[in-house]
């Protein structure tokens, strides 16, 4: 998945602690997201996102990756391999810089990711959508993600599970 040309015209790489200032800037550009999912981002919350893992998973299963246009970070994704089962990839977070939204950047990345995961034998992608975040819900549904009917509570909001069969 990490091949540089896979997401052309964007380059992709694993993000590190040295990228936190840039990631935080991207997070801060998305005030609408943090209205649905408080609190506002901080250095510590970015670190938490970079290290967060679901039960029984290790950092080897986690891909906290950045998508770059030239040298500018334009999107961040937290992808967990084989979760919650061996045929599923789980997107824990996907955020596009506010200034790039509405231009097809996010859709392009998700479509390419779907192609890559399919060729690697993955059968579905699963994620959570904050219930009240209607723009996010529309975005994922346009990309053929369907609500599964499962719902869980996050600290400040209800989250709806959605998945796409590959």
Task: Go through the PLM ranges and name each one.
Residues 5-10, 14-20, 25-99, 110-112, ...:
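Acetyl-CoA-dependent GNAT
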């Amino acid at each position: 998945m990490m091949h540089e040309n896979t997401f052309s015209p964007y380059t992709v790489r694993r993000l590190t602690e040295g990228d936190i200032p840039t990631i935080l800037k991207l997070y801060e550009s998305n005030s609408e997201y943090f209205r649905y999912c408080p609190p506002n981002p901080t250095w510590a919350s970015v670190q938490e996102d970079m290290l967060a893992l679901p039960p029984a998973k290790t950092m080897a299963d986690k891909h906290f990756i950045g998508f770059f246009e030239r040298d500018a970070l334009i999107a961040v994704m937290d992808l967990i391999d084989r979760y919650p089962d061996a045929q599923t990839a789980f997107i824990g977070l996907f955020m596009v810089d506010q200034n790039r939204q509405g231009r097809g950047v996010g859709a392009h990345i998700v479509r390419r990711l779907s192609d890559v995961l399919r060729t690697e034998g993955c059968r579905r992608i699963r994620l959570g959508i904050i219930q009240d975040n209607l723009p996010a819900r529309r975005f994922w549904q346009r990309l053929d993600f369907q609500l599964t009917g499962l719902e869980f509570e996050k600290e400040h909001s209800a989250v709806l599970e959605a998945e796409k069969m590959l």
